[in-house]
């Protein structure tokens, strides 16, 4: 009887060990991936191409929402504080950031790119440097492909600090991404410089970097702010430009 009980107990223990072993080896990992939060799509695109498999990442400002007027919710701020990295454009594009406490794990991309001084700031003494006053610069710098390359480098260097990310894979993805940007730059040079009409009439002036690179002239209805109301004088001027230069599309 005692031998029978011992055999039964031994069998139960063996089954328990086998069960635990398979639970550990066959169950999917419940470890959470490090989270990276970005403010706009240009950063989202870079992160997606560099290491989307190894991290959880999301764009803070929803598609279709005006970047300039966006305000984060308390839930958004909690997510930012808990993230492994928060990336934002800077240069005044996200006004809510000014005066907001941000943890050390943040990256202001405007500090590593070439910025255009706004026309109304041109009469101020200005020097290219890393610490600048916001709102003196056009914040739409990612439309310059060279700036996208600089942004990709800065983001890659920050991602390398996250221990869960495979460094060699990240470096290779970065090189692939830079190659694709160079190819896009060549296409731009081949097509945009040969445009017959160099006048761009826009509702919202977000294309000054492209205009500078490829010799376009920008005529903007609402300036840098997409929700600004144009004056009657501006509308008359735009109408004259459209007629004079045979602009077919605004």
Language model regions located:
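N-terminal secretory signal peptides that target proteins for export/translocation
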Residues: 1-3
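Extracytoplasmic metal-acquisition and chelation regions
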Residues: 5-9, 13-16, 21-249
């Amino acid at each position: 009887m005692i031998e029978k009980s011992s055999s039964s107990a031994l069998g139960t223990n063996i089954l328990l060990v086998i069960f635990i072993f398979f639970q550990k080896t066959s169950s999917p990992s419940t470890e959470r991936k490090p989270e990276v939060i970005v403010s706009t799509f240009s950063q989202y695109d870079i992160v997606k191409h560099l290491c989307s498999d190894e991290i959880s990442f999301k764009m803070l400002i929803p598609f279709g929402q005006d970047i300039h007027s966006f305000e984060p919710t308390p839930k958004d701020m909690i997510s930012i504080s808990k993230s492994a990295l928060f990336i934002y454009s800077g240069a005044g594009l996200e006004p809510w950031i000014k005066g907001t406490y941000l943890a050390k794990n943040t990256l202001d991309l405007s500090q590593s790119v070439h910025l255009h001084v706004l026309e109304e700031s041109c009469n101020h003494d200005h020097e290219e440097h890393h610490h600048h006053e916001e709102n003196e610069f056009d914040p739409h710098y990612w439309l310059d492909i060279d700036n996208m390359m600089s942004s990709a480098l800065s983001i890659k260097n920050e991602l390398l600090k996250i221990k869960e990310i495979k460094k060699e894979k990240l470096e290779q993805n970065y090189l692939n991404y830079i190659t694709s940007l160079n190819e896009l730059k060549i296409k731009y040079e081949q097509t945009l410089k040969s445009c017959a009409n160099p006048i761009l009439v826009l509702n919202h002036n977000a294309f000054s970097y492209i205009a500078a690179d490829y010799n376009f002239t920008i005529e903007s209805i609402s300036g840098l702010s997409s929700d600004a109301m144009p004056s009657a004088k501006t509308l008359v001027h735009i109408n004259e430009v459209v007629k004079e230069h045979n602009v077919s599309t605004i």
